[in-house]
Amino acid sequence: MAEEGSSTKDSESFSVLNWDQVSRLHEVLTEVVPIHGRGNFPTLEITLKDIVQTVRGRLEEAGINVQDVRLNGSAAGHVLVKDNGLGCKDLDLIFHVALPTEAEFQLVRDVVLCSLLNFLPEGVNKLKISPVTLKEAYVQKLVKVCTDTDRWSLISLSNKNGRNVELKFVDSIRRQFEFSVDSFQIILDSLLFFYDCSGNPISEHFHPTVIGESMYGDFEEAFDHLQNRLIATKNPEEIRGGGLLKYSNLLVRDFRPADQEEIKTLERYMCSRFFIDFPDILEQQRKLETYLQNHFSDEERSKYDYLMILRRVVNESTVCLMGHERRQTLNLISLLALRVLAEQNIIPSATNVTCYYQPAPYVSDGNFNNYYIAHPPITYSQPYPTWLPCN
């Protein structure tokens, strides 16, 4: 009975895509995506279908078996619900492979880089281009994670418009989603097999069965959340520091909490994790600037609203941080918001702004000196912790 219950629960995670969804998936896989090179390197014109088939073929030739290939993230959400509010930014592909040693990690990286040679324009002398050169020219981000619970690597190919092609090679990973609406993965193998073997074009009456999975656990519930723009998750204590930024991104796109009572607990978890993962103010600044660049590159008007929402959440839900550190982060967010307004030339004129000043009580003290002598900033290290454990 236990096994039957487990099987039923697992089956709830999967769903068969309808024709409209398969059609959108076909469009995503066959759309030409430019990979922009640095310096004098030419732009590569690729499709997800071609890069997947090339990389998978070379991996198997090298002795690495690919269990399956999946479309992940916002692109998968776009396939399932076209106008879902999330857009279709990064094009995330997951290759499930075995990565038992460092040799496999290195082999995967070399295979991907060498695969890029296939997409160079005609006339380019490929013999003189090394994998290291290709990495410097076309790779925006290269990540390798090896822990007790996670073994995976990521190679992100550059796109100036923010539509990076991200190839993720996963042996094991503890958590693959933050919220139910970004928990979807679409298994591509049946469609890739169709491309390889079918002589007929894909159509409503002639297409393969394509399966989608929600890592949230309940596909129908997660699908309902995506359709109705609801925010929900499971085991929020497992969400990494970037979850706070994603949560604020959902709020600025008019998503709303599915459960108002649970959301404050969720916010406190995410704020605590953000400051644990990014304790230094410079780290926080880099993280925020990178997030804005990657997720709002063509949405300048939304940046300010996003930062104000993030500031409100940090201000209301931060419980594990010392007061001065919290104020420092709030000030950082405010300065970034001011910079966004300056870049958009919409800072209000001072003639239209009314400032209210309430003198502090100590001003009435006869010994109070209202002159301030500026001193250069003093750089010092902090030997004490900047966050406190939550109860």
UniProtKB/Swiss-Prot annotation:
Its EC number is 2.7.7.19. Belongs to the TENT family. It catalyses: RNA(n) + ATP = RNA(n)-3'-adenine ribonucleotide + diphosphate. Changing residue 295 to A: Loss of polynucleotide adenylyltransferase activity. The lineage of its organism: Eukaryota, Metazoa, Chordata, Craniata, Vertebrata. Changing residue 248 to A: Does not affect polynucleotide adenylyltransferase activity. Increases cell apoptosis. Disulfide bonds: none annotated. Changing residue 92 to A: Loss of polynucleotide adenylyltransferase activity. Disruption phenotype: Animals do not display major developmental phenotypes. They suffer from anemia with lower hemoglobin levels compared to controls. They have increased proliferation of B cells. One of its GO terms (cellular component) is centrosome. Keywords: Cytoplasm, Cytoskeleton, Nucleotidyltransferase, Nucleus, RNA-binding, Transferase. PANTHER family: PRION-LIKE- Q/N-RICH -DOMAIN-BEARING PROTEIN PROTEIN 44, TERMINAL NUCLEOTIDYLTRANSFERASE 5C. Changing residue 77 to S: Increases polynucleotide adenylyltransferase activity. This is Terminal nucleotidyltransferase 5C. GO terms for molecular function: poly(A) RNA polymerase activity; RNA binding. It holds the Pfam family NTP_transf_7. It comes from the Eukaryota. It is found in: Nucleus; Cytoplasm; Cytoplasm, Cytoskeleton, Microtubule organizing center, Centrosome.
